[in-house]
Amino acid sequence: MRRIPVLLPFLLLVALPCAGLAQEAPRDPPPAASEAAPQDAEEGTAPATDAPEAGAEAGDAAEDATTDEDAPVPAADDPDAADAGDTKVPLAEIQRYVLVYRAIKEAYVDAVQDRELMESAIRGLLLDLDPHSAYLGKSEAATLDEQTSGAYEGIGVELLQQQDRSLKVVAPIDGTPAARAGVLAGDLIVAIDGKPIAQVEGMEPLRGPAGSTVVITIVREGRDGPFDLSMQRETIRVTSVRSRMLEPGYGYVRLSTFQADTGADFRQQLDELLAQSGGRLRGLVLDLRSNPGGLLTAAVQVADELLDSGAIVSTRGRAPASDTRFDATGGDRLQGAPVVVLVDAGSASAAEVLAGALRDNDRARVVGSRTFGKGSVQTVLPLGNGDSVKLTTARYYTPSGRSIQASGIVPDVELQPDPKYIGGTPPATALRTVTEAVLPGHLRGDEEEDGYQPGSPLPGDAPVSAALAELKKMAGKPATAAAAGGD
């Protein structure tokens, strides 16, 4: 069975084998959410397959388990049964499941397909674990495969599907129909083409042929009642790296997500900036605003281009193979020139890994607002019929050993949002209900604070100007001393 790790996020992806699963060489794919390419949930389409229905097969297996008279069945109230081992299958609980399964098959007022029952059962197993563990149907699983290629047909928005199936916008992707139509981080999509979210199949209705029209109904804090936004779907080719010169000697690189080619593209565009500056930059602004994450390996590659040595990130989980560490290989491409990392409340997962790595190594100063706080790693486990399970398998830690789960990264220099970009609402309102710490059932963070103040989205050019001003302050000082700072 091939494992496809994801970081999603809402997006942090890393290949992490699970105990007891046959392993193949892991491939380097996607993140975790999005209608587009990166992070924790999104729309997608995949061709139907002739694979046998998992429900019937699993149902038969469950029945076999109950008819084996020789199999020991622990009592439901036997404490030793629960403590016997974390990986032991609770046969008594499975018997209860089979009884309910049989009752539904034999007596429910309408016929129910095995696949529907099994899919619901699997969703139920994952529902209360954490917001990022989920059952992925064929279309949703196909979306993850599209995420690393950065090409798909849709509206271009990163989404998080909540337990009530509602869709929260993590961030619109730069230059896409969603961004042009005015979709904002923190928006709640309550209907698609007039149909309530509860009546549609996940995020799939957001996908469709390029040129077709879709209408989404949005609820936004600070606005009176729902409102509609109409947009035409496009073939979304997400360019994850863009760059330009802000002023002579001062470069700017925008990373919108982390895809398979992000590391190579970053290196190429950094070299172009260096060439424009006679081989040496006075400083660099690295813009990670509204970057929902993506491939962990891509974030590691970008960090490695800016570090001579030191740890970049480590991951730790229950399975031994979940414990990994990534170190810089040497060769700072900027030769110590100062770096400012620009973040906001939409910076999540792999984006937080990069920001944390550069700051903990005293290589950059972080400017902006508090980040999302997604410090977990997801692994995608294919089920053999086109469906998959996305399971949280590890937490990641910055070089200082700190987990940002449900706490985020607090910048060295905090900026306030321009109210005109968030409908005149007070700072922090737009993303208040979509940060990791307020997601129902989120993993408790090591440094999580009750009632902490979440960050804000920081759209527009003003934050870039503020980052450049900070960069100029640093430019006349040794990079290490200038970049020092902490939470």
What do these predicted regions represent?
Residues 95, 242-487:
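C-terminal "post-core" interaction segments
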Residues 2-5, 10, 18-283, 290-292, ...:
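Flexible, low-complexity junctional segments that flank or bridge functional domains
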